[in-house]
Structures are given as structure tokens and as C-alpha cells.
Amino acid sequence: MINLILIRHGQSQWNLENRFTGWYDAELTEKGIEEAKKAGLLIKELGLSFNFGFSSFQQRAIKTLENILLTSELKIPNIIKAWQLNERHYGALQGLNKSETAKKHGDKQVMIWRRSYDTPPPPQDKNDPNHPSNLDIYKNIDSKLIPDSESLKDTYNRTIPYYLDNIEPLLKKSENIIISAHGNSLRALCKKIFEISDAMIVELEIPTGNPIHVVFDNKLNILDYKYLDSTRAKNFIIKK
């Protein structure tokens, strides 16, 4: 059997403040750190070993994986950070309070930006100092690849080629893997892995800091999947 752990980072400061976070590098809150540590204990109970751990470039995902390793006592020899696993870029909405934005633009418009599959928010100004093209961490990435705004579809088109080229081949070699990422990059991965339709994927809610354990056979057919913390589990939507 082959094991894949998918985990959304623990609660971040901007999650707590109900802001659109996107590519902003928000830190974990104390609650978020504790969520990550608890996730590590849950993973430890599985009694598995992992050779690869993946995270995005963003600190909330990196620190979540670090805290998982701390409490699980896992020794993962290969830790890989990939910007392709970053959160969806929320464009000009980044940093705005979600409730206040709904009051300004209307609930319907904000829900289209947040939950439609293929409608991105207005783009972030390239002159914004927080635009990723102006940050040192992304200086070695082709500027043409750096988004100003993304829909969930755009996030899927960024994340899944990386998964197919770099993660799926490892699974096919029977490597156990942990991926620490974000709500929307994990939606993209779940859409691919579970073959969820465009219409249904927008309804998938993934809680912070709760590991999803997926078990495959050697042909990557899914044998089982579940949240390790059943008290905070969200229902999977596995529909075509």
C-alpha cells in the first residue's frame, strides 16, 4: 500500500482576521501551531515512514510541516518546497477583510470570486510591494509564470502539472508522501486524485490542520481515505 497525507496548514493570522490571504506570507497563530503539532501526533499513530515531504513556498505551510515532523518524530530525508503548491492568488482582494469586501461589492459578487471555478478576482497591481514578482523569494521564477490573480481553475492548471511531474511518479514508486499546502491548492489536488467535477469541487471545504490520509494500491487506485481527526472532518464530495 502507498500512503499520501494531504494537510492544509494550521490557522494563520489572516485566517483569524478573516482576510483574503492568497500569496501573502501570513504566519501561523498559536492555534495554528497547535493544530500542526496535533496533526503530527495523529500521523505518528499511523506508524508509517515517509521519504518525501512537500510544501509550498509559504511559511504557514512550511511551519506546519516542521511542526508535524517535531511531534511525529518522523525523519523525512527529502523535504521539497514548490511554489506551484502555493495558495490561490486572490489578486486585488489580497489583504481585504472578507465581510467588509462583501459589504462593498455585494455577497453575490464576492461569492463568484471566492467559489466559482473559473472566475478570478481583479488583478493585483504589479507595483504593489507585496506582488510576488517584487519579492526576493520568487526572483528565480520566470515572471511570466507569476500570477496577478487566479481562479480555482488557474490554481489547478498551476498545481497539477507539478503533481504529475514530481509527486505522482514517486507514488508510483511506492513512496509515502506528506504534502503541506493550502485550501485551494489542496482542492486542486483532490480534484485530480478523486476525479471531482468542476461543479462539485467548489463545494469541497478543507479544514486547517487536519490530515487527510489517502491509501493507494500499487496502480494508484484509491483503497481508502479519511480525515485523521474525525471530530473536525468535513465531508468529501466524490461526485463526477
Give, region by region, the residue ranges found by the protein language model.
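Short beta-strand scaffold positions
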Residues: 55-56, 179-181
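Loop-to-helix element that buttresses phosphate recognition and phosphoryl-transfer chemistry
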Residues: 11-67, 71, 146-163, 203
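Internal catalytic-core helix/loop-beta-alpha segment
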Residues: 112-116, 121-123, 135, 141-161
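Acidic, low-complexity terminal tails and accessory targeting/binding regions
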Residues: 2-3, 39, 85-100, 148, ...
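Short, hydrophobic/glycine-enriched beta-strand segments
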Residues: 3-9, 179
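Active-site glycine-centered loops adjacent to acidic/histidine catalytic or metal-binding residues
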Residues: 9, 84, 182
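Phosphate-coordination/substrate-recognition cap region in phosphate-metabolizing enzymes
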Residues: 39-132, 138, 191-215, 222
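Short active-site segment of divalent metal-dependent hydrolases/proteases
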Residues: 12, 185-186
